[in-house]
Amino acid sequence: MYLPVDFHTPLLYLAVVGILLVFALPLGISAFFRWRTFRADANGLQTYARRRDLRIQSGLSIGLVVLAIASAFTALIGWQKSTNNLVSNVETRYAVTDVRVTNWNGTWAQVDLVTDDGVKHDDLSAYTGDFYAPILQGTMAGNSQLSAEELGIKLR
């Protein structure tokens, strides 16, 4: 009935991006300076083994950067899909219009929405329950967390 919402996987991909860049950047910087030294050496010192090592180091650095970029795009696509699915799920379950996700992390998202009655709610926490059913909670007039029904957001 509800579309799958997964905010954990994009965060994992972002962690992979960070790890890949931690290895790729120093490796690439080292390869750059080694290439400069290699080119400045006399012809007798420019051996095939050194050239091969530099190519391997440069290729590995470039490969890691390409994997980091691919992981970043995968995270972006996954986040966008989960955001669209969450908006669709909220609009399916609750009598609301104009749902906008303003913030997110691995377990919840902050949403702003307008009910069918025209009441605007800002900074509601949207969780996913069983089978990706959205659960909205928020505060009103300094109260503790209130459910969607207590905030006047009707179910469909």
What feature does the model see in each segment?
Residues T102-R156:
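Extracytosolic and intramembrane catalytic regions of membrane-associated proteins
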